Design a protein with these regions (language model features):
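Catalytic nucleophile-loop/oxyanion-hole region of alpha/beta-hydrolase
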Residues: 94, 108-149
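Catalytic active-site module of serine/aspartate enzymes centered on a nucleophile-bearing elbow/loop
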Residues: 306-338
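Short, surface-exposed "cap/lid" segments of acyl-processing enzymes
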Residues: 55-116, 135
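Conserved loop-alpha-helix segment in the C-terminal half of the alpha/beta-hydrolase fold
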Residues: 280-301
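Short beta-strand/loop motif that positions the catalytic acidic residue
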Residues: 270, 276-278
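N-terminal cap/lid segment of alpha/beta-hydrolase-fold proteins
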Residues: 14-65, 314-316, 320
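Alpha/beta-hydrolase-fold enzymes
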Residues: 138-140, 149-248
Length: 338
């Protein structure tokens, strides 16, 4: 991806915050923001909400490699994200331009309603990802659709890569190609980075302000799930994960969770076309922690851009747009279809 940041929006933090705060306002007014919601029942008597944006049957494909049967692009959102996140709305626009159907399965607790089960979601949630992809494939094929493609944003991208690693040769039976965008593939490095300095003051506080109330609501439905005083006193993601995310999802502690959930150590196991896009100036992800060519399989393409921030990639004159990244990623995915 060839990306040049606007001169008026320098630095990783501005390139992260501006799209999330300003660009999303314009995107929320677009027709693509009018999703159709479907609720799936899960095997553990819970639910997953999926927001669909269907392409018009007459929409021509932009890429000659796109098959006549409409592909489905599935997006797995980031930490505390949703189908209303700026990147989800931007991908919805691009999918429509390609004549593809589009779906955003929500991780538990992120669709606007607290789930019933004790579990929430986490960065290594590959079993949940696999179940969602299977449901998407079954539904899309039953409707006469074409291949399934997947993109994961930040946390969702790490979980998607972990699914591909665990699925091995069988992954290609479900997904034609996948991409991760600004994903913390080394969770230990990223977890420590987001807990320091400006990151701690701004991003960590923002995440915890959303995650703590959800955890407390889950506690009301599942008494004894965790110590509420300790959770409310948590000051960063390390402490929150140690009290809630790790023990609730079967990990010993934060260190065990971050180590076992990280996709980077297993990227040599990926057996289908996969793209990993990261910005060198991402404030969440230290550049030194990004995977290198020698650490991934021949099926993995690495794009490391100098700028872009964390899932930002603003472009153009004030007030900028955020189509550059979704357009580049979608074009790469389309290029993997035969």
């Amino acid at each position: 991806m060839k990306y040049i940041a606007p001169n008026w929006l320098p630095g990783g933090n501005l390139q992260t915050i501006w799209p999330a705060v300003v660009s999303v306002r314009a995107l929320a007014q677009t027709p693509e923001a009018a999703y159709q919601r479907v609720r799936w029942d899960t095997p553990d008597h819970d639910f997953i909400d999926v927001d669909y944006a269907y392409a018009a049957p007459s929409t021509p494909a932009l890429n000659q490699k796109t098959p006549q049967k409409r592909p489905l692009l599935a997006l797995f959102h980031g930490l505390e994200g949703s189908s209303a996140s700026h990147y989800a709305l931007a991908f919805a626009q691009v999918a429509k331009q390609y004549g593809w159907d589009y779906a955003v399965p929500h991780f538990r607790g992120c669709s606007g309603e607290i789930n019933r089960a004790p579990r929430a979601y986490h960065s290594g949630d590959y079993e949940e990802i696999g179940w969602m992809l299977g449901k998407l494939q079954d539904y899309h094929v039953a409707e006469g659709g074409g291949p399934l493609l997947a993109v994961g944003i930040s946390l969702g991208g790490n979980a998607l890569m972990r699914w591909a690693q665990e699925a091995g040769e069988t992954a290609a039976h479900t997904v034609a190609a996948l991409a991760s965008v600004c994903s913390p593939l080394d969770l230990t490095a990223s977890g420590h980075a987001i807990g320091q300095g400006f990151n701690r003051l701004v991003y960590t506080r923002m995440f915890l302000n959303s995650m703590k109330p959800k955890a407390m609501a889950r506690l009301k439905l599942n008494p004894g799930l965790f110590d509420p005083q300790k959770l409310l006193a948590s000051r960063d993601l390390y402490e929150f994960d140690n009290i809630f995310t790790a023990p609730v999802h079967g990990f010993k502690n934060t260190e065990d969770y971050w180590l076992r959930a990280s996709a980077k150590p297993h990227m040599h196991r990926i057996k289908l076309p996969a793209l990993a896009l990261n910005a060198i100036n991402d404030p969440f992800i230290p550049a030194r922690s990004l995977p290198q060519t020698s650490q991934v399989s021949r099926h993995v393409t690495l794009w490391h851009t100098a700028h872009g921030g964390h899932v930002g990639y603003p472009q153009g004159r004030f007030p900028a747009h955020v189509q550059a990244m979704p357009e580049a990623v979608t074009a790469w995915l389309a290029g993997q279809l035969s």
